[in-house]
Amino acid sequence: MSNTILKCTTRHVRIFTAVVENNDLIFDNGHLTLDIDPDNEFSWSDQSIKKVQDYFRELVDFQADNELSDYSLRKIGSLLEDFIRKLLKDGELSYNPNSRVMNYSMGLPRTQELL
């Protein structure tokens, strides 16, 4: 396998086969780096970040015996994206009112008026 960084990029999740050194991605086939919500669309509590990180570890551990490929990395990213949507729907996560753009990419906020 070449020293090409594998990556998965979704709206709210970025995963790389790399480590971060001096704000640069350095290829490391034995390491996955997770970047959650790079555009700061959501307001995150420490607990909600931990839930996403724990689920990420669970998905990576499940994949551990298989070869890492673009497909498997995209699958992990898609499952994390769905998990973030669930956190938002369950009220454990909210949109960031100070976000650069308010586009409600995962649906309108759930408020009493809309329920």
From Swiss-Prot:
The keyword Zinc-finger does not apply. PANTHER family: NAD(P)H-QUINONE OXIDOREDUCTASE SUBUNIT M, CHLOROPLASTIC. Its EC number is 7.1.1.-. Pfam families: NdhM (PF10664). NDH-1 shuttles electrons from an unknown electron donor, via FMN and iron-sulfur (Fe-S) centers, to quinones in the respiratory and/or the photosynthetic chain. The immediate electron acceptor for the enzyme in this species is believed to be plastoquinone. Couples the redox reaction to proton translocation, and thus conserves the redox energy in a proton gradient. Cyanobacterial NDH-1 also plays a role in inorganic carbon-concentration. It is a peripheral membrane protein. This is NAD(P)H-quinone oxidoreductase subunit M. One of its GO terms (cellular component) is plasma membrane-derived thylakoid membrane. Its main location: membrane. Belongs to the complex I NdhM subunit family. It catalyses: a plastoquinone + NADH + (n+1) H(+)(in) = a plastoquinol + NAD(+) + n H(+)(out); a plastoquinone + NADPH + (n+1) H(+)(in) = a plastoquinol + NADP(+) + n H(+)(out). NDH-1 can be composed of about 15 different subunits; different subcomplexes with different compositions have been identified which probably have different functions. GO terms for molecular function: oxidoreductase activity, acting on NAD(P)H, quinone or similar compound as acceptor; quinone binding. It is found in: Cellular thylakoid membrane. Keywords: Membrane, NAD, NADP, Plastoquinone, Quinone, Thylakoid, Translocase, Transport. It comes from Prochlorococcus marinus (strain NATL2A). It is an enzyme of class 7 (translocase). HAMAP family: NDH1_NDH1M.
